[in-house]
Amino acid sequence: MFCYQCEQTDRTGARPGCASAKGNCGKDATTADLQDLLVHAVKGIAQYGAIARAMGAPDRDADRFVLYAMFTTLTNVNFHAARFVALLREAAQMRDRVKAACDASARAAGTVVPAQHGPAMWQPADDLAGLLEQAARVGVDNGLDKVGADIVGLRALVLYGLKGVCAYAHHARVLGYERDDIYEGIEAALAFLARDPDDVNALLTQALGLGRLNLTVMELLDSANTGRFGAQQPTAVRVSPVAGKAILVSGHDLGDLHALLEQTAGTGIHVYTHGEMLPAHAYPVLKAFPHLVGNYGGAWQDQQSDFAHFPGPILMTSNCIIEPMPQYRQRIFTTGPVGWPGVRHLEHHDFSTLIRAAQALPGFPATAAEETITVGFGRHAVLGVADKVIDAVKAGQIRHFFLIGGCDGAAPGRNYYTEFAEQAPDDTVVMTLGCNKYRFNRHAFGDIGGIPRLLDVGQCNDSYSAIRIATALADAFECGVNDLPLSLVISWFEQKAAAVLLTLLALGLRNIRLGPTLPAFVTPGVLAVLVEQFGIQPIGDAGTDLAASLARHAA
């Protein structure tokens, strides 16, 4: 295996990346290699999918399969090697179906389908050993000896950003929202990668194009979330347990949570959120269920402790699963793209097995003293008081805004974000999103003239809200976003964050502080380009960076 797609990748060798029997995320070499081969297979689907679309015959099932398949290869999503063997065979069948449709359309038009090469010609080997042999030839570092580390790193930047785009598009799709132009853009990016591009400018152009596509995808996902569940509202969320039977829901999928709430209504079972599901409490349709009683635990990397102590079953939706510990292995369930060998997987929103487990397990014996945190400051809530915010800035009550958000993780150096937020002066406002918020969301920040100093915008999926808030402020002050008293301090971990970063760069945002370490696939040569064109900066000392941010905008 060779994998360097996440922030926690091995950096102890001469070349960063996980290249042993098991990666730092817990993914074994077999699964990692099969994931590489699945990406290769999906490129082949896209090659013919682009032709089919140009002929006026797009295949919606193939479009959806591409999203799902790519999502399964994100960090901490699916660790089940047997599942990837099945997906590889399904990918070949899907590719052949799209190819047959292309051939039929061409015959009807009296033309022929242009010859395809590379991934479009792949055929799955008969057994696992053969598949692994194939995978060894199509890994992310394929061609390193010919094109060098900079080109391989830029290809990885495009690929990992594309994985994030596909994940966000899948989130929207399962809520019933999808668009042809998004599928077209994803196909085009995959077909681009299928050609093994080796031009720096073409790769950078493609990366920024994906950033623009991801903005469209996040806008669609925002429409999906608000269309299905209403606009977020500021809401106090209980973070201490209530006596009774209990189910814990982690991940990101609001649709799964909604289906579970419907199925548990009237059963006496309490439902708790975990990790990135915390913002669910701000959506009117979801918080209307009285048995959605609170949030339990912290960010995804705390799950082994959180889940072990939770007295009920756990449902893992979308990404962020870690190897289940023996204390809860028999009471954790997966759904959607998530998978772990030996863990029961639930399909089609049928949560009856999960509910029976909750009824059999003890639940919380007593109600603890109430503690709350406040969420729900999405774009509708913040822009609804925009006049008040603008007046506070003009009056000198608000000096600066910080967006401190992104993915959390267990690596050393992430206390930087806690220190940065807690040291922010009292005349500044901190916006946050993603699970990075758990680093400081129990700190008492207070308010400025009734405006909370800590504004929880939502999930990492809600980056669109943060962008809309920033652009609305820029419009109000008749300036560019880069001219606002606003600093972006971003924590990254996996490929959704890579997609969001590309979106910020595509929008022309500069001087982003990124950490806790820079992506391993960003070579010194690529970093030099990003620094020159976008002013990207690695994080340093929290106090020093905070002072520099305030000084830059005060100058």
From Swiss-Prot:
Pfam families: Prismane (PF03063). Belongs to the HCP family. It is an enzyme of class 1 (oxidoreductase). Binds 1 [4Fe-4S] cluster. It is found in: Cytoplasm. Catalyzes the reduction of hydroxylamine to form NH(3) and H(2)O. It comes from Burkholderia lata (strain ATCC 17760 / DSM 23089 / LMG 22485 / NCIMB 9086 / R18194 / 383). One of its GO terms (molecular function) is metal ion binding. It catalyses: A + NH4(+) + H2O = hydroxylamine + AH2 + H(+). NCBIfam families: hybrid_clust, PRK05290.1. GO terms for cellular component: cytoplasm. The modification Cysteine persulfide is found at residue 407. Its main location: cytoplasm. This is Hydroxylamine reductase. GO terms for biological process: response to hydrogen peroxide. Its cofactor is [4Fe-4S] cluster; hybrid [4Fe-2O-2S] cluster. It comes from the Bacteria. [4Fe-4S] cluster binds at residues 3, 6, 18, 25.
